[in-house]
């Protein structure tokens, strides 16, 4: 009879596994690359940020465990190439983490949303996710096992006054995840999403118009804004927290978890911040 705690707390949770991480050169992706390698995985970083990608490989320090491949996730040939490169170099593909994404503009008004911007966000966030899953499934189905992950957003769990292109693209990604889970489960392949609250990343800095600002100023400014809106206080969500969620879903600890949208938002999506704030004000007035 197996014990209920069979996992060695010091073990490498992805030992022997091979992963592709799109958008892996910076932000959540880069943090996940480092964590996956730490836990024994061999990782192919897929990104369009060539300098950052090569720099990350150099930082990790061994081509035996990490490789960079230029990949525009909206290009079928690029995505096919990165999957084929992983199989050619490391012999297989166990994990596809479709993490690449763009935010588009911050303006939440539909009349201010440019058609080309809307299409571009869908091209990267949705079509890019579709291509990642399609080419991962191509090599996973014959092996009758595998794990496909998407980075979604808590904005797809609720309606928020956010940019339509970004929010709707994440809703679409969640739908893709569910459909793939139903189809690919028949081949032993698990499919899940990780949906974070706001995290300070280069993508978010760009969305806030702070791409070239001092990193410490960016961090303090955006974290302050996020903290004021957050439901869970006294703790800050970081890229490492999303990487840890991805690690769990990619590991054998989650071997029977599929079709899940793991929302990492401190309970934000199950609350009504505006109503809560109104009640708090009313309570304060009543007890003056």
From Swiss-Prot:
GO terms for molecular function: oxidoreductase activity. One of its GO terms (biological process) is terpenoid biosynthetic process. NAD(+) binds at residues 26-28, 47, 72-73, 99-101, 166, 170, 201. It holds the Pfam family adh_short_C2. Its EC number is 1.1.1.1, 1.1.1.-. Substrate binds at residues 153, 166. It catalyses: 4,5,8-trihydroxycasbene + 2 NAD(+) = jolkinol C + 2 NADH + 2 H(+); a secondary alcohol + NAD(+) = a ketone + NADH + H(+); a primary alcohol + NAD(+) = an aldehyde + NADH + H(+). Keywords: NAD, Oxidoreductase. Pathway: Secondary metabolite biosynthesis; terpenoid biosynthesis. Homodimer. Belongs to the short-chain dehydrogenases/reductases (SDR) family. Involved in the biosynthesis of macrocyclic lathyrane type diterpenoids (also called Euphorbia factors) natural products, including the cyclization route from casbene to jolkinol C, a precursor for ingenol mebutate that is used to treat actinic keratosis, a precancerous skin condition. Catalyzes the conversion of 4,5,8-trihydroxycasbene into jolkinol C in presence of NAD. Also mediates the formation of casbene dione derivative and 4-ketocasbene from 4-hydroxy-8-ketocasbene and 4-hydroxycasbene, respectively. PANTHER family: 3-OXOACYL-(ACYL-CARRIER-PROTEIN) REDUCTASE (AFU_ORTHOLOGUE AFUA_6G11210), SECOISOLARICIRESINOL DEHYDROGENASE. This is Short chain aldehyde dehydrogenase 1. It comes from Euphorbia lathyris. The lineage of its organism: Eukaryota, Viridiplantae, Streptophyta, Embryophyta, Tracheophyta.
């Amino acid at each position: 009879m197996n014990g209920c705690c069979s996992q060695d707390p010091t073990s490498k949770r992805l030992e022997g596994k091979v992963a592709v991480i799109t958008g892996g050169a910076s932000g959540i992706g880069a943090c996940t690359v480092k964590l996956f390698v730490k836990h024994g995985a061999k990782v192919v970083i897929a990104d369009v940020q060539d300098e950052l990608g090569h720099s990350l490989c150099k930082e990790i320090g061994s081509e035996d465990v990490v490789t960079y491949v230029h990949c525009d996730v909206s290009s079928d040939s690029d995505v096919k190439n990165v999957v084929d490169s992983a199989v050619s170099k490391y012999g297989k593909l166990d994990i596809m983490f479709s993490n690449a994404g763009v935010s588009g503009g911050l303006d939440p008004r539909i009349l201010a949303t440019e058609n080309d911007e809307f299409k571009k966000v869908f091209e990267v966030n949705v079509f890019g996710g579709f291509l990642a899953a399609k080419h991962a499934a191509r090599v996973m189905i014959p092996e009758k096992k595998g794990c496909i992950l998407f980075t979604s957003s808590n904005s797809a769990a609720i309606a928020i006054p956010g940019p339509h292109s970004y929010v709707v693209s994440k809703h679409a990604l969640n739908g893709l995840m569910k459909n793939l889970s139903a189809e690919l489960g028949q081949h032993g392949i698990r499919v899940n999403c990780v949906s974070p609250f706001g995290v300070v990343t280069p993508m978010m800095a760009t969305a806030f118009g702070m791409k070239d600002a001092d990193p410490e100023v960016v961090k303090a400014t955006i974290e302050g804004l996020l903290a004021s809106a957050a439901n869970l206080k006294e703790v800050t969500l970081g890229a490492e927290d999303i990487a840890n969620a991805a690690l769990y879903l990619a590991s054998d600890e989650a071997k029977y978890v599929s079709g899940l949208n793991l929302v990492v938002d401190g309970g934000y999506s199950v609350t009504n911040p505006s109503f809560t704030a109104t009640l708090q004000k009313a309570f304060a007035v009543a007890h003056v």
